[in-house]
UniProtKB/Swiss-Prot annotation:
It comes from Rattus norvegicus. The modification Phosphoserine is found at residues 819, 1310. It is a multi-pass membrane protein. Disulfide bonds join 291-348, 389-447, 490-543, 954-988, 973-990. SMART domains: GPS, IG, IGc2. This is Adhesion G protein-coupled receptor F5.
């Protein structure tokens, strides 16, 4: 037994050996412990074969043998380690070779414990770490992964083992020998030989690495010979160990391989772990990057960006590197206050010998987004209000803080939930904390989010504290009488509010049209104004200022004393004749009002007399009898009126009653009710007092007109209004003055439809009742409120009654008395249609025998066209209306389109006073609830009831015609062919002509006519030729410019030609733009149309003025020969005249007329003619220039034909001058002819020939410019021939010119030229258009369309 003082040290060797012996027995221990007894290792398998024994013969086998050595002297350990390191492997023996030996486990006594450590690269198996006692205080392994120290040897083994995971080192090395193809064949002898020799050398060199397992050659590649191999080790090599191993490899390798030591190159796998904290980086965070590597090295670095810039310790960066237990390395980079500028690529490098390990990570910054309402308004009324701040970012917030800054200090209570990243700050401000009358004291509250890593994000909330408004209302008591006006002023000392409104004591809101609101810097004011008070205004009124949920209210009592309105006083007689000696009774009656008594006096001339009161049914009548006496003169006219005074001492007087006192000589007509009169006398009496039959106590309205014929009063006209309808008329007059008209209107419309149905018989016979209903509809349509479907149903029920065929006789009599009633009725219907609010409900189809209504609501993204059809079987009429999607797209969302059709209105509407042309179709009115972009194109189809005779016309109702009584107007509406059989139908559409003939013609041909089609074809074809020709002209001029501008005359001539072509080209393009704007596909954009009109005007004028410049320049060169102005002077004058004058004229025209919106036509983009004669700003300069050019041409031609001695310019100059005269002679007459034909088209009804000639000359003028202004120039011809190197043609041309035996192909005397001259009358052809349009729209027009025959 060993002594306790004996210090024993154990260590275990792993010996890997190879043997060629044949084994016929199981493996047994071949090395036993030197001190431990054999029975202590019973059952422990120390011999582990690497390969199974092959049956049948000797095979080289590899075995791993665990050898346990114990000794008492600790110093022996280092000696044995040194000895093992000095061995050169393989160690050859008799039949067995030792391939490698490694120390795995060392046990040393410490105190009373035996501590067993694993050598580097080895570890205790995991199960031993769990079941045995570990010595944690001495354990250098990373916690939680494995252990490398146990207390005592495990009794049943095993010893320390290589870890199951290992590190693969990929290495390349170069052999400085020639590469042979067999090295690519793994089965070749050369490949096997190289592989065996190299692996033996590699194994011998790398076995010294801790935890070495194996080495394998993987391939040979070219580049001399490059050897790729992998080394597997259990743990990372120590610094310098790879270099040392490489030296051993070269020492152990046969020198014939010529291995290059400097060619060792490591290719590591990713052995670096990279972590970023925090995972999501916010601006302001302190960010930590950590690289962890199992390779321990002192050579570590960090870099930034694509250029891999080195990072050093600074105020911004901090680098810290540590080695853990000598087996792993951790390097940390801390970036302080990370910003958007710091974002990018970051990487770490760990260099170990020939290996470089590292990784790269891109860092992005996430902005902190705080959600909060940036502005809040708080009323200091002690009600709590919450400010909310939330972060969109999911972050590890450490705290959320609230701060405030402002003139007043109002603190709140914070409530924070870090999990939801939200915080609430509750404020509760009372009146003592806010300055009185404060209308906007702002305090900035800031919520700040702070993350664990240092990032901060904040949001400012501007809170405006407003004190509760103190209202001051008109202090004086308000006491008025009916018919008088009053106003109530309500003042607030605070200017901040959300809403101001007035209501009655019953809570009924007053319509905003009755009050105004004004906001001041330190307060606000609202004034309720009633211009005509009624008894309904009697009561208490509340002025209410609302701010958020706080209400400030001021009240005022209003007393309205009853007093009849002047229009409510019924008088008898209105006018009468009486005998000078007889007494006469005057009567004034009003509706009885709950016993209200008035002081009533009658005023006769300058005297007043008290009246007697008598109640008759529902009327209170006041009478006075004028006693009979012989006046100072007879006959005599007397004016009498009654005067009502109420309890408030307010008064009203009636209209005057006229009494004519006569001596009685010629009196032939006498009646106790009507009175007396001489033959031919006409008087009016109220139906109420004319003996018209009525129920007792009822009040009827209207008047009866009588005429004395012979000895009898004959009733001329009767316009009486039945009592029920008269009552409704009086209610309608009161309703439009009522404070609650919105609330009363639906019930009133319902009562009106019921009463109209009951009074249908009276309406048929009484134009007065019919006129009263029209007046009622007119009054009610002015109420500013929305109309719903039920209200519209009641309105159409009323309309159905008054438009019945049986009422046509009443309509005829009514229109004889009041010709504007039909127009007034139609206007009322359109106002109701525009006020119809359909909302989300299904648009109703309202059907009656005499009126139908259909509608549609335009929703956002609406793609369906509006198309409605109306059929009236009883009237044998039908029609439909359509609006395309393009037009609907210009409407506001939720707009309502309403169409109302009437079969009988055609016979009722007033007819054209000149033509007396009736409408023989439906009348359809289409309205849109919101404003529309004009023109708004609409298509309609009507049934044609007059197939055999008459020409149909599409017309609309123009309210402004005939002194605003209205009439049919055909402006802007045309009959078109819709491609179907049109014998029984007429297709109408608003359209605008685009052919050139309309530029000056107010009486343009009808669309669809043969003339219109022909003019359009000529216009489009001509414009195409013109634009192409003008462009070609400019190209030709650019090509030959240097050749044809060698003298001043030619230079200036071509300057003029180029500018004429350029101006005409731009004018034609603008003309196309103008046509596109108004040609049926796009809404007329006013701004674009003004621009198009201006530029057409300007550039067409420029064409004329450049022609004038050309003429003046020719005149100057021929007449003032001795005077020679410089080229720059001529150019300055030319450009000033060519562009300056047109600019001045066109600018003045638009500046004077556009502010009054009379610059251009209503429905076309050209100068106005009807309103301002703006077209003269184009016509007058053009005519003057034509006359001047013609005069110059005559002078020039005369001068050329009869030259004088001494005046003859040089040969080249004369050639140029002759060309100029030729051009002027060709171009100017054509301009004159064009303008002459244009003037001819102005005359209404002008012959179609003028339209055709004008369009033809105007459209093709660009072609004429190219031919006669450019190509006829002999110098241009020569320059073009020379330009294209046509040597034969050019030489012949030159020769013939010099010898005079032939002429140029395009010269004036050539055969071709002569034919040209004969064709065009020896002149060129050039034309400039003078645009104008024909159609004019009427501003005050109806949406009602119909058909005239």
């Amino acid at each position: 037994m060993k002594s306790s003082r004996t210090v024993t040290l154990y260590f275990v060797l792993i010996v890997i050996c190879s043997s060629e012996a044949t084994w016929s027995r199981p493996a047994e221990p071949i090395v036993h412990p030197l001190i431990l007894q054999e029975h202590e290792l019973a059952g422990e398998e120390l011999l582990r074969p690497k390969r199974a024994v092959a049956v049948g013969g000797p095979v080289a086998e590899e075995y791993t043998v665990d050898v346990e050595i114990s000794f008492e002297n600790v110093s022996f350990l280092e000696s044995i380690r040194a000895h093992l390191n000095s061995l050169r492997f393989p160690v050859q023996g008799n039949g067995t070779d030792i391939l490698s030996m490694a120390m795995t486990t060392v046990c040393t006594p410490t105190g009373n414990d035996l501590l067993c450590f694993c050598e580097k690269g080895y570890q205790w198996p995991e199960e031993r770490c769990l079941s045995s006692l570990t010595c944690q205080e001495h354990d250098s392994a990373l916690p939680g992964r494995y252990c490398n120290c146990l207390k005592g040897l495990p009794p049943q083994g095993p010893f320390c083992q290589l870890p199951e995971t290992y590190i693969t080192l990929k290495i390349k090395v170069r052999l400085n020998i020639g590469f042979q193809e067999d090295l690519e064949n793994t089965s070749s002898a050369l490949y096997r030989s190289y592989k065996t020799d190299l692996e033996r050398a590699f194994r011998a060199g790398y076995r010294t690495l801790p935890g070495f397992r194996s080495v394998t050659v993987t391939q040979f590649t070219k580049g001399s010979v490059v050897v790729d191999y992998i080394v597997e080790v259990a743990s990372a090599p120590l610094p310098g160990s790879i270099h040392k191993a490489n030296e051993q490899v070269i020492q152990n390798l046969n020198q014939t391989y010529k291995m290059d030591y400097n060619s060792f190159q490591g290719t590591p796998s990713n052995e670096t772990k990279f972590t970023v904290t925090p995972e999501f980086i916010f601006e302001g965070d302190n960010v930590t990057l950590e690289c962890e590597s199992e390779f321990v090295s002192s050579n570590t670095s960090w870099f930034y960006g694509e250029k891999r810039s080195d990072i050093q310790n600074s105020d911004k960066f901090s680098i810290h590197t540590s080695i853990i237990n000598n087996i792993s390395l951790v390097t940390r980079l801390t970036i302080f206050n990370f910003t958007q500028h710091d974002a990018g690529l970051y990487g770490c490098n760990v260099t170990l010998d020939i290996f470089e390990y590292g990784t790269v990570r891109k860092l992005d910054v996430t902005p902190i987004r705080i959600l909060a309402k940036e502005e809040r308004k708080v009323v200091c009324d002690n009600n709590p209000i919450s400010l909310n701040c939330c972060s969109e970012n999911i972050a590890n917030w450490s705290r959320i803080e609230w701060k405030q800054e402002g003139k007043i200090n109002i603190e709140g209570t914070p409530e924070t939930d870090l999990e939801s990243s939200c915080s609430t700050y509750t404020l509760k401000a009372d009146g003592t904390q806010c300055p009185s009358g404060s209308s906007g004291t702002t305090v900035i509250y800031t919520c700040e989010f702070v993350s664990v890593y240092g990032a901060k994000g904040s949001k400012n909330i501007a809170v405006t504290f407003t004190s509760v408004a103190n209202l001051t209302i008109t202090p004086d008591p308000i006491s008025v009488s009916e018919g008088q006006s009053f106003s109530i002023t309500c003042l607030s000392d605070v200017s901040s509010f959300d809403e101001v409104y007035w209501n009655t004591s019953a809570g009924i809101k007053i319509h905003p049209r009755f009050y105004t609101m004004r906001r001041y810097r330190d307060g606000a004011e609202s004034v309720l104004t009633v211009k005509t008070s009624t008894r309904e205004w009697n009561g208490t009124y509340h002025c209410i200022f609302r701010y958020k949920n706080s209400y400030s209210i001021a009240t005022k009592d209003v007393t309205v004393h009853p007093l009849p309105l002047e229009s409510d006083i019924m008088m008898d007689p209105l006018e009468a004749s009486g005998l000078c000696t007889s007494s006469h009774q005057f009567k004034c009656c009003i509706e009885e009002n709950d016993g209200e008594e008035y002081i009533v006096t009658f005023h006769v001339d300058s005297s007043s007399f008290p009246a007697e009161r008598e109640v008759i049914g529902k009327q209170a009548c006041y009478t006075y009898s004028l006693p009979g006496k012989l006046p100072s003169r007879c006959p005599k006219d007397i004016d009498v009126f009654c005067h009502f005074t109420n309890a408030a001492n307010s008064s009203v007087r009636s209209p005057s009653m006229k009494l004519t006192l006569v001596p009685g000589k010629n009196i032939t007509c006498q009646d106790p009710i009507i009175g007396i009169g001489e033959p031919g006398k006409v008087i009016q009496k109220l139906c109420q007092f004319a003996g018209v039959s009525r129920s007792p106590g009822q009040t009827i309205g209207g008047t009866v007109t009588y005429k004395c014929v012979g000895s009898q009063w004959k009733e001329e006209t009767r316009a009486c209004i039945s009592a029920p309808i008269n009552g409704l008329l009086q209610l309608a007059k009161a309703l439009i003055k009522s404070p609650s008209q919105d609330q009363k209107l639906p019930k009133y419309l319902r009562d009106l439809s019921v009463s109209t149905g009951k009074e249908e018989q009276d309406i048929r016979s009484s134009p007065g009742s019919l006129g009263a209903i029209i007046s009622i509809l007119d009054l009610l349509s002015t109420v500013p409120t929305q109309v719903n479907s039920e209200m519209m149903r009641d309105i159409l029920a009323t309309i159905n009654v008054i438009l019945d065929k049986s009422t046509l006789n009443s309509w005829e009599k009514l229109l004889q008395q009041q010709s504007n009633q039909s127009s007034q009725f139609l206007q009322s219907v359109e106002r109701f249609s525009k006020a119809l609010e359909l909302g989300d409900s299904t648009p109703p189809f309202l059907f009656h025998p005499n009126v139908q209504m259909k509608s549609m609501v335009i929703k956002r993204g609406h793609a369906q066209m509006y198309q409605q059809k109306f059929v009236f079987t009883d009237s044998d009429l039908w029609g439909d209306v359509a609006i395309d999607e393009c037009q609907l797209g210009s409407l506001q969302p939720d707009s309502s389109i309403v169409t109302v059709a009437f079969p009988t209105l055609k016979a009722i509407l007033a007819q054209d006073g000149q033509r007396k042309t009736p409408s023989n179709s439906l009348v359809m009115t289409t309205t849109v609830s919101h404003n529309i972009v004009k023109p708004f194109r609409i298509s309609m189809t009507f049934k044609n009831n007059h197939r055999s005779g008459g020409k149909p016309q599409c017309v609309f109702w123009n309210f402004s015609l005939a002194n605003n009584t209205g009439g049919w107007d055909s402006s802007g509406c045309t009959v078109e062919d819709d491609g179907r059989d049109n014998r029984d139908r007429v297709f109408c559409k608003c359209n605008h002509l685009t052919s050139f003939s309309i530029l000056m013609s107010p009486d343009s041909p009808d669309p669809g006519s043969l003339l219109k089609i022909l003019l359009d074809i000529i216009s489009y074809i001509g414009l195409g030729f013109s634009i192409v020709s003008l462009a070609a002209c400019l190209v030709v001029e650019a090509m030959v410019w240097k050749s044809v501008t060698k003298n001043r005359t030619s230079y200036m001539r071509h300057i003029c030609i180029v500018n004429i072509a350029l101006c005409l080209l731009i004018a034609d393009i603008w003309f196309i733009v103008a046509g596109a704007i108004h040609d049926g596909h796009y809404p007329l954009n006013e701004t674009a149309c003004v621009a198009a009109t201006f530029f057409i005007h300007f550039f067409y004028l420029s064409v004329f003025f450049w022609m004038l410049t050309l003429g003046l320049m020719l005149f100057y060169r021929l007449i003032f020969i001795l005077h020679d102005a410089s080229k720059s002077t001529q150019k300055a004058i030319a450009f000033s005249l060519g562009y300056g004058c047109p600019l001045i004229i066109s600018s003045i025209t638009v500046g004077v007329t556009q502010p009054q919106e009379v610059y251009m036509r209503k429905n076309a983009c050209w100068l106005n003619w009807e309103d301002t004669r703006a077209l003269l700003a184009f016509a007058i300069p053009a005519l003057i220039i034509v006359v001047v050019n013609v005069s110059i041409t005559v002078v020039v031609i005369t001068k050329i034909l009869r030259p004088s001695v001494g005046d003859k310019p040089g040969k080249q100059e004369k050639s140029s001058l002759f060309q100029i005269s030729k051009s002027i002679g060709v171009l100017t007459p054509l301009l004159g002819l064009t303008w002459g034909f244009g003037l001819a088209t102005v005359i209404q009804g002008s012959n179609a020939v003028f339209h055709i000639i004008f369009t033809l000359l105007n459209a093709f003028q660009g072609l004429f410019i190219l031919l006669f202004g450019c190509l006829w120039d002999q110098k241009v011809q020569e320059a073009l021939l020379h330009k294209f190197s046509l040597s034969r043609w050019s030489s012949q041309h030159s020769k013939s010119t010099s010898l005079g035996s032939s002429t140029p192909v395009f010269s004036m005397s050539s055969p071709i030229s002569r034919r040209f001259n004969n064709l065009f009358g020896k002149t060129g052809t050039y034309n400039v258009s003078t645009p104008e349009t024909t159609s004019s729209s009427v501003e005050n027009s109806s949406s009602a369309y119909s058909l005239l025959n």
